[in-house]
């Protein structure tokens, strides 16, 4: 039998189920943590994170399915405010992207979550800066910054982090070609006051210069200037 509920009713029902699940997981996490059952507690934190991602995606859907013409724009404005993505070109002529969170693990629905806020941010950036910059032979760098309060045992393996959506979004803007022959990848982790993900695209010839600067990158990021040097044109 076909579901005769409206899209809004379906989304609200899903929201209710996810909220109940999150409440249950929250209670289980508290109990496990108090009892020092750390391995199972950690698994529950991952379940909670996964359900939270689904709830966020569903929450973005509800305003849109109401049919109001301004809904998509209104949702994007909220994301812009609540998930402040920073991007631009540094004084060295490097592309820099900063996101105020660690990227989710693979297989947790993270690609949709990332696309939801990163793609609109990239579109805004391209509207404001329309220079045709394309790095040819380049290095794509991911720097995962963990909060000083984060348990080192929970640092993520680099090959278990959802990167593809970010790479694809960045490639459209600043890479002539993201094939392995022209674009090499480098991954590293660091400790900071607040967790975040930093992405850089730099000319291959500048890699050792970036490595020398890496330990001294400020919490606020490398300074972005209005008229950077253009490489690879």
Residue ranges and their predicted role:
Residues 75-84:
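Long, charge-patterned amphipathic interaction tracts in eukaryotic proteins
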Residues 179-232:
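C-terminal edge-of-domain segments
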Residues 1-68, 72, 90-94:
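N-terminal targeting/trafficking signals and adjacent low-complexity tails
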Residues 112-141, 148-150:
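An N-terminal amphipathic alpha-helical segment
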Residues 102-116:
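Acidic/glycine-enriched edge-of-secondary-structure segments
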Residues 87-91, 130-136, 191:
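Short glycine/proline-enriched loop/turn "hinge" motifs that connect secondary-structure elements
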Residues 84-103, 141-146:
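Short amphipathic
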Residues 147-190:
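Short, hydrophobic/π-rich interface segment
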């Amino acid at each position: 039998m076909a579901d005769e509920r409206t899209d809004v009713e379906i989304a609200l029902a899903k929201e209710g189920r996810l909220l109940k699940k999150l409440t249950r997981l929250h209670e289980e996490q508290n109990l496990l943590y108090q009892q020092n059952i750390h391995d199972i507690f950690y698994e529950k934190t991952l379940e909670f994170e996964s359900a939270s991602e689904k709830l966020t995606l569903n929450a973005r859907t509800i305003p849109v399915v109401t049919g109001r013409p301004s809904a998509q724009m209104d949702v994007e404005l909220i994301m812009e405010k609540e998930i402040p993505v920073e991007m631009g070109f540094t004084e060295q002529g490097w592309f820099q992207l900063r996101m105020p969170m660690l990227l989710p693990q693979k297989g947790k629905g993270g690609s949709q979550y990332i696309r939801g806020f990163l793609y609109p941010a990239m579109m805004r950036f391209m509207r404001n800066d329309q220079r045709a910059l394309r790095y040819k032979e380049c290095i794509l760098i991911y720097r995962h910054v963990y909060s000083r309060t984060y348990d080192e045992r929970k640092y993520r393996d680099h090959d278990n982090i959802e990167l593809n959506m970010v790479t694809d979004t960045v490639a459209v803007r600043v890479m002539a070609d993201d094939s392995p022959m022209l674009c090499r990848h480098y991954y590293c982790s660091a400790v900071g006051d607040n967790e975040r993900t930093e992405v850089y695209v730099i000319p291959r010839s500048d890699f050792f210069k970036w490595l020398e600067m890496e330990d001294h990158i400020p919490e606020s990021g490398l300074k972005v200037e209005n008229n950077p040097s253009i490489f690879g044109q």
